[in-house]
Amino acid sequence: MRYLYIIFILFHLAAASYGQIFYAVNPNPKYEVRAVWLTTIGGIDWPHSYAQSERSAEKQKEELRAILDRLQKANINTVLLQTRIRATTIYPSQYEPWDGCLSGIPGKSPGYDALRFAIDECHKRGMEVHAWVVTIPVGKWNSYGCRQLRKRFPRLIKRIDQDG
């Protein structure tokens, strides 16, 4: 019983000293991260409309501004924005095509760089943006993004079942 008591005391001393060491290394963390995931695939979070003209692109931007305003009021300071969806992107890329979530047509630009816009709007509100990329899977074998990636890098993608 005495040994158990000694082990118990040593364990708590070690745990307490670890906390003091950790605090000494990082006494003032930059800040507390209060983050949300902002999903773009299928318009789950944003966008809820397609940018097929200047007017509709502005409406799409307003949707994001409204979301960010609500997040700011909720004291969110970090947005994890889905920027790459199944081998397609929401920003201009020389490697992968535009995702259809913005324009409604896979491979078609919405007329603006949605990632740049999101970064600028988040920074206006004192928020950070972190890119959330979906790396695997790239999508169904015959989806637009997968086909484009296969054309450019045929050895990069391996078909794993009937759908890809």
Segments (PLM) and residue ranges:
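Residues that line or immediately flank small-molecule/substrate-binding pockets and catalytic motifs
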Residues: 8, 40, 83
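Sec-dependent N-terminal signal peptides
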Residues: 3-13
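N-terminal module-boundary/linker segments of secreted carbohydrate-active enzymes
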Residues: 21-30
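Short, well-ordered coil/turn segments that N-cap beta-strands
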Residues: 30-33, 75-77, 123-129
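Active-site-adjacent "subsite" loops/lids of carbohydrate-active enzymes
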Residues: 31-33, 39, 43-62, 131, ...
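Aromatic-lined carbohydrate-binding/catalytic grooves of carbohydrate-active enzymes
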Residues: 74-110
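Boundary at the C-terminal end of the N-terminal hydrophobic targeting segment
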Residues: 16-19
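Aromatic- and glycine-enriched glycan-recognition loops and surfaces
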Residues: 53-74, 101-125
